[in-house]
């Protein structure tokens, strides 16, 4: 079996194979951004009802509540995922809109100036916003599905991924 290159190594394991937080103290402070996306798929009748009601449910504004929950999640990512560094979030923006008749697209873009990226924060924000949409709509149906959730782009650090957002 060929030896793994240093770049292909799992960064949250030390040489003894024990979990560890990555030491970012030697990294340069740079602008970082990431955009993640999650989708919620509704049964046709539920999607039609949500469209007719302007994305409002008995619990209130679905989009507004999802944005608030997603933003809170972005700021608390380091409390949810053990080896994420606490970051000074400079910006967190959501775009939530229909992507077809039955699919709600949720995009979360996060920015900061720091030594490590914000991919996990963007993924967490999009995920929690999608979970919140589910919670707001579950009285209508439990036949909704969430996913895929994915990283769309990231900027800053060693490499950029995806189109600039």
UniProtKB/Swiss-Prot annotation:
Substrate binds at residues 83-85, 120-121. Pathway: Cofactor biosynthesis; molybdopterin biosynthesis. SUPFAM superfamilies: Molybdenum cofactor biosynthesis protein C, MoaC. One of its GO terms (biological process) is Mo-molybdopterin cofactor biosynthetic process. GO terms for molecular function: cyclic pyranopterin monophosphate synthase activity. Disulfide bonds: none annotated. Homohexamer; trimer of dimers. This is Cyclic pyranopterin monophosphate synthase. It comes from Xanthomonas oryzae pv. oryzae (strain PXO99A). The lineage of its organism: Bacteria, Pseudomonadati, Pseudomonadota, Gammaproteobacteria, Lysobacterales.
């Amino acid at each position: 079996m060929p030896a793994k290159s240093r770049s292909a190594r799992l960064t949250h394991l030390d040489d003894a194979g024990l979990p560890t937080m990555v030491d970012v103290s030697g990294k340069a402070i740079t602008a970082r951004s990431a955009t993640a996306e999650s989708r919620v798929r509704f049964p046709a009748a539920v999607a039609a009802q949500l469209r007719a009601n302007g994305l409002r449910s008995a619990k209130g504004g679905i989009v507004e509540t999802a944005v608030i929950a997603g933003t809170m999640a972005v700021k608390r990512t380091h409390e949810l995922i053990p080896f994420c560094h606490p970051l000074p979030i400079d910006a967190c923006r959501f775009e939530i809109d229909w992507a077809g008749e039955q699919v709600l697209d949720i995009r979360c873009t996060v920015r900061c100036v720091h030594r490590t990226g914000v991919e996990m924060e963007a993924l967490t924000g999009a995920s929690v916003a999608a979970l919140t949409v589910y919670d707001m709509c579950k009285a209508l149906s439990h036949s909704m599905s969430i996913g895929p959730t994915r990283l769309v782009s990231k900027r800053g650090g060693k490499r950029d991924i995806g189109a600039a957002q």
